[in-house]
């Protein structure tokens, strides 16, 4: 009996082991998530795993970063090469064609193996932001019906706006008032002299002033997992990789948007006032989050064949890099 009491006492003295934290991409989709939303999340999460799960934490700091866009390194499956995967995002989303006037684009359309075309393509991948190509690739892989594939995020933001309250496959919503859900996209405006927020974006879209505005969108893969009041997003070409971002949610499930300042509105990854002496200015989540694209489609496009050739987007060739 004394021995049993001794064991119990020793057990109480043992340090508590930390609970295993769940990975947002490893949790099965909750009840009620549509089939197309499941497909979008699965495609985005699959790519995030390939890139060794880098992420930006709730404080807007890069907490982990593995291989990057132009490296000749294997991804997590030990088969795909990093730069070739990015070239695949361009090719397989039908967004490479509109970039044809830009040096190196034609080389990315060629099979890998030639030293000249490989180097030319890798230079193209470095010089031309591929985040919209990544989004378009995910939507293609998930067979989202009617999605506007484009090398510019603003094109599908505009399409969601033009669709109105019944827009398909996405409708435009205010991220400050509507709750994000898996399969949605959250977007910010960049390289502007001042912040606009949702109201300013709506005014600009209504007057036709958005043109080739620079913007950036990321895919919602989980929201408030286990009541943690955290939004989990995945985007491409974030720190030159496929990165997960964490944002805080309020008690109602709406995003607690970090307030953008003049510095973060005019830059994308590196904030102007961020320095070792001013750590409080270093927050990659402090952006002009102006658009929440709510997924309205519920079922993937019928008879989808991921290996079939895709028609090019309706956009004209783009003479200069225009997207992030």
Name these PLM-found stretches.
Residues 17-21:
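Sec/Tat signal peptide C-region and signal peptidase I cleavage site
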Residues 7-16:
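Bacterial N-terminal signal peptides
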Residues 240-324:
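Low-complexity, Gly/Ser/Thr/Pro-rich intrinsically disordered linker/tail segments
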Residues 142-150:
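Short, well-structured beta-strand/strand-turn elements
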Residues 1-7:
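Bacterial N-terminal signal peptides that target proteins for export
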Residues 150-239:
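...with weaker cross-activation on analogous glycine-rich loops/strands in unrelated enzymes
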Residues 22-142, 288, 293-324:
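N-terminal capping segments
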Residues 71-76, 83, 92-120, 162-170, ...:
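Surface-exposed intrinsically disordered loops and tails
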């Amino acid at each position: 009996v004394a021995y049993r009491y001794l064991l119990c006492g020793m057990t109480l003295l043992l340090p508590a082991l930390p609970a295993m934290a769940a990975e947002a991409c490893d949790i099965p989709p909750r009840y009620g998530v549509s089939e197309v939303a499941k497909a979008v999340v699965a495609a985005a999460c699959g790519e995030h795993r390939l890139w060794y799960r880098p992420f930006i934490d709730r404080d807007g700091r890069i907490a982990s970063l593995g291989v990057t866009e132009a490296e000749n390194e294997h991804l997590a499956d030990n088969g795909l090469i990093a730069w070739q995967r990015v070239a695949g995002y361009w090719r397989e989303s039908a967004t490479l064609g509109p970039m044809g006037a830009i040096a190196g684009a034609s080389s990315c359309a060629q099979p890998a193996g030639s030293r000249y075309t490989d180097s030319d393509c890798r230079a193209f991948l470095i010089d031309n932001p591929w985040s919209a190509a990544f989004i378009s690739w995910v939507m293609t892989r998930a067979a989202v019906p009617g999605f506007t594939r484009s090398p510019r995020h603003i094109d599908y933001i505009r399409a969601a706006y033009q669709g109105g309250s019944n827009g398909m496959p996405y409708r435009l919503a205010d991220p400050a008032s509507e709750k994000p859900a898996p399969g949605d996209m959250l977007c910010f405006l960049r390289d502007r002299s001042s912040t606009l927020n949702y109201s300013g974006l709506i005014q600009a879209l209504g007057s036709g002033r958005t043109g080739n505005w620079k913007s950036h969108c990321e895919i919602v893969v989980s929201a408030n997992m286990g009541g943690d009041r955290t939004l989990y997003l995945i985007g491409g070409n974030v720190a030159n990789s496929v990165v997960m971002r964490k944002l805080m949610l309020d008690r109602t499930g709406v995003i607690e948007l970090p307030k953008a300042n003049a510095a973060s509105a005019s830059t994308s990854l590196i904030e102007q006032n961020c320095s070792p002496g001013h750590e409080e200015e270093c927050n990659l989540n402090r952006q002009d989050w102006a658009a929440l694209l709510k997924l309205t489609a519920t079922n993937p496009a019928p008879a989808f064949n991921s290996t079939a050739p895709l028609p090019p987007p309706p956009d004209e060739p783009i003479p200069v890099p225009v997207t992030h």
